Amino acid sequence: MKVRVWRYDVPTDVREEFEREYGPEGSWAKLFAASPGFLGTSLYVDVRSRTSYLTVDRFADDEAWQLFRAEHDTAYQEVGVRLRHLTTAQDDLV
């Protein structure tokens, strides 16, 4: 299994929109679903700060992830640009 983990800092005034867009039914998950190897997305919030989040995106294996990126890179970049106002920092952890 290939797991991608990202950490995000989110301003309080856009938390609801962030949770919609980055959650299991959001824009990223819908885009990833174009891959037959996509297994799901989970969203976690830091209960102490309420402004730090983790996303965990699961693919069948690294090959499925690489194939998705090769076939959907333009859409991937477009979603990133469209949603960048929802975060003040992001780190690709895994």
Q: Where in this protein do the model-derived segments appear?
A:
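Short, well-ordered beta-strand segments in beta-rich or mixed alpha/beta enzyme
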Residues: 2-9, 40-70
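N-terminal presequence-like segments and adjacent domain-start helices
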Residues: 8-11, 15-16
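Alpha-helix N-cap/helix-start motif
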Residues: 15-18, 52
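An amphipathic, aromatic/His-enriched active-site/gating alpha helix that lines ligand/cofactor pockets
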Residues: 17, 23-39, 58-94
